[in-house]
Amino acid sequence: LNEVRASGKYKLYDGNYEDILTYKAEYNCESMLESNRIFDASNSMDEFSFFEVMNHWRTDKLDMSGSNNQFNGTGWGFMVPQKKLYDAFVQEEGVDGYRLNQTMKTYDQISQLGVKVAKGQSLINEGYFMWKRRFSNVESPAGFWCSYNNYRWMRYAEVLLLAAEANLKDGNQSEAD
């Protein structure tokens, strides 16, 4: 891990953090291992995946008609942020914190984007929505469960964290810092 850090081949992503896991930031300076998914209109089902559907909001319970159709209408609402995570972000950086607002949104925030619980429906979550890994219509031109957004399997931020933990456990405080 220390060799990877010393290599100078990678650095932390310096773009909009909310885009780090979207198609907008494919092959960025922080990406170490990434799947190459290519949009091919003649073979769009080649990019079929449950990943986006599982991680996207529970769209069958939402009215997204006011969102200018920027979000994909297919999602099952797994991996929903909980209030405990939201509160930890707020404690660290406040309700206007950059990382908080680039990582997740409250129900009030997505309502301002035109996404609301549909009439007669209810959501089983604590009112927080993943934002860093949202599923847009742009990355899914074929619709439904297909996306050409690359998967990031290893990011440099993870290497830095793992190296700090390993160095600390090994008693090497200067490398851990």
Predicted ranges, named:
Residues 1-119:
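An aromatic- and glycine-enriched ligand-binding surface/loop that stacks and positions planar moieties
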Residues 1-5, 33, 100-102, 150-177:
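Extended, hydrophobic/aromatic-rich amphipathic alpha-helical segments that build helical scaffolds
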Residues 6, 25, 41, 88, ...:
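A sequence-composition feature that detects small, non-aromatic residues
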Residues 62, 136-138, 159:
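General helical structural elements
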Residues 114-155:
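Active-site beta-strand/loop architecture of penicillin-binding DD-peptidases
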